[in-house]
Curated annotation (Swiss-Prot):
Disulfide bonds join C2-C16, C9-C20, C15-C26. Negative results: does not show effect on rat Nav1.8/SCN10A. It comes from Lineus lacteus (Ribbon worm). One of its GO terms (molecular function) is sodium channel regulator activity. Belongs to the nemertide family. Coiled coil: none annotated. This is Nemertide alpha-3. Keywords: Disulfide bond, Hydroxylation, Ion channel impairing toxin, Knottin, Neurotoxin, Secreted, Toxin, Voltage-gated sodium channel impairing toxin. The presence of a 'disulfide through disulfide knot' structurally defines this protein as a knottin.
Amino acid sequence: GCIKTGSGCTLSKGCCTKNCGWNFKCNPPNQ
């Protein structure tokens, strides 16, 4: 699942999945 960019990531990093606490894993938009 991906959350909208801006929650700890920039647009260039695609989408992010919430990992743990304040940490976010950023993945390319195609994942």
